[in-house]
């Protein structure tokens, strides 16, 4: 009963100002998050509350989404979707977004936002999937065109195997974008001792079979960006 009441209150608090439409148009980028949004406690027991750190400024979401490329008629997987910070910024540009998270509270939260923001005829454009610990992401073979992994990579178990699974489930020519915190002192982010240097992530992408790995540690103040592609034809 209390869980249902909490969800009802959450829906009322996050009621957005945008109107529902039967097209891809509309202001999806200003979903008002609230104190009712659940917090992430990661695999090492650290609570991450980026919603209250001016994330809309330091994360530079428009820059990140632009890096995903032309998303028209594309399917995008948002791994570690959390409260949907990127999910709802990608949705206006893509045909479909698959929001993946390991925490059922976030899945319930995203489903409640979907019921508010999308007309029923458009529900299929946002699908939530619950990930299992120490298991590959729940994505089917060659199901997606783009995969985004933000503030999540350092917590993955058996990362090479995980990346190999992502590569397999990307369509030929697909793109993987990984963003995580630089291994240095920053005002926000996890402790430095659990952060991963950019060059380590780069090497692991190559080990997993990705081609054309590009790195950037200047676009974002606190984070680095890696972009990897799956070649069009695989022997």
Language-model segments: which ranges?
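N-terminal, positively charged/glycine-rich alpha-helical extensions of SAM-dependent methyltransferases
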Residues: 18-46
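Conserved alpha-helix/loop element of class I SAM-dependent methyltransferases that forms part
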Residues: 55-74
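Conserved class I S-adenosyl-L-methionine
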Residues: 177-202
């Amino acid at each position: 009963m209390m869980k249902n009441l909490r969800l009802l209150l959450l829906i009322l608090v996050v009621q957005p100002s945008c109107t529902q439409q039967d097209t891809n148009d509309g202001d999806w980028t200003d979903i008002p998050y609230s104190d009712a949004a659940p917090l992430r406690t990661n695999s090492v027991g650290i609570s991450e509350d980026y919603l209250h750190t001016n994330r809309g400024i330091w994360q530079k979401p428009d820059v990140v989404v632009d890096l995903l490329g032309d998303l028209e008629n594309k399917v995008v997987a948002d791994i570690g979707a959390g409260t949907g910070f990127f999910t709802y910024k990608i949705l206006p540009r893509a045909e479909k977004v698959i929001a993946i998270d390991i925490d059922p509270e976030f899945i319930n939260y995203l489903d409640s936002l979907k019921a508010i923001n999308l007309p029923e005829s458009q529900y299929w454009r946002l699908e939530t999937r619950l990930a299992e610990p120490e298991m590959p992401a729940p994505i089917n073979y060659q199901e997606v065109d783009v995969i985004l992994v933000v503030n999540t990579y350092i917590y993955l178990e058996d990362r090479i195997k995980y990346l190999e699974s992502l590569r397999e489930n990307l369509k030929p020519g697909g793109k993987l974008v990984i963003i995580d915190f630089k291994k240095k002192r920053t005002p926000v982010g996890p402790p430095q001792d659990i952060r991963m240097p950019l060059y380590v992530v780069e090497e692991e992408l190559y080990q997993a079979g990705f081609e054309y790995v590009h790195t950037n540690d200047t676009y974002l103040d606190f984070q680095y960006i890696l972009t990897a592609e799956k070649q069009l034809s695989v022997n």
